[in-house]
C-alpha cells in the first residue's frame, strides 16, 4: 500500500474521496445533460438518492457526507478533501442557475441549499427508514430552484 500511497491511510482516504467525488460529478453531469429543467434535474437526483438508500436497506448514505461528519472533524486533510467536493458540487449547481438567469449571489446561496438539503434528508431517511424525507425534500428544493429560474 505504501508504494502506491506513500502518505499511508490518510492519502488513500483522500484519493478515495476524490474518486467517489468524480463518480458523483459524472452522475450529476449526466442528469444535467438529460434536462434543462433544474426542477426536474433536482427531483431526479433526490429520487436516485432515495432508490440507492433503499437498495442498501438504509445502510449507505452519501459517502462524502459520512466522511465530513466523522473522520474529517479530526483530520484536516480529510476535511479539506470533503470541503473541495462539496464546493465543486455547489459550483456546478450555481453555474446551471447562473446560466438560467439567476443572479450570481442568489445562485450561490441556492446552490448551497441544494447541496446541503440531500445530506439532511439522507439522515432523516435513515432514521425513519423511509425514502419520504428525500422525496419530500427533493420536491421542495426543485420548487425553490424552479421559482428562482422563473424569476431570473
Regions found by a protein language model. Name each.
Residues 15-18, 28-60, 110-114:
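Hydrophobic alpha-helical connector segments
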Residues 3-32, 43, 83, 90:
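An amphipathic alpha-helix adjacent to DNA-recognition modules
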Residues 35, 74-76, 86-111, 147-152:
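Hydrophobic alpha-helical bundle segments that form small-molecule/ligand-binding pockets
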Residues 65, 104-124, 136, 140-144:
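Hydrophobic alpha-helical segments that form the core
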Residues 19, 23-30, 48, 52, ...:
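Solvent-exposed, charged/polar functional surfaces in cytosolic regulatory/catalytic domains
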Residues 52-55, 95, 115-132, 144-151:
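Amphipathic C-terminal alpha-helical segment
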Residues 40-42, 56-80:
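Amphipathic alpha-helical segments used for helix-helix packing
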Residues 30-32, 50-54, 64-73, 96:
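Helix-loop "lid/cap" segments that line or gate small-molecule binding pockets
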Amino acid at each position: 500500500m505504501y508504494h502506491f500511497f506513500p502518505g499511508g491511510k490518510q492519502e488513500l482516504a483522500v484519493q478515495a474521496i476524490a474518486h467517489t467525488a468524480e463518480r458523483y460529478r459524472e452522475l450529476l453531469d449526466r442528469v444535467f445533460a438529460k434536462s434543462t429543467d433544474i426542477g426536474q434535474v433536482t427531483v431526479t437526483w433526490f429520487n436516485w438518492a432515495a432508490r440507492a438508500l433503499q437498495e442498501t436497506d438504509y445502510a449507505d448514505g452519501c459517502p462524502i457526507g459520512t466522511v465530513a461528519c466523522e473522520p474529517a472533524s479530526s483530520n484536516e486533510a480529510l476535511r479539506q478533501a470533503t470541503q473541495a467536493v462539496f464546493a465543486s458540487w455547489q459550483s456546478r449547481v450555481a453555474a446551471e442557475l447562473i446560466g438560467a438567469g439567476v443572479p450570481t449571489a442568489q445562485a450561490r446561496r441556492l446552490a448551497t441549499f441544494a447541496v446541503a438539503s440531500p445530506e439532511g434528508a439522507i439522515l432523516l431517511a435513515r432514521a425513519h427508514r423511509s425514502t419520504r424525507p428525500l422525496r419530500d425534500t427533493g420536491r421542495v428544493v426543485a420548487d425553490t430552484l424552479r421559482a428562482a429560474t422563473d424569476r431570473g
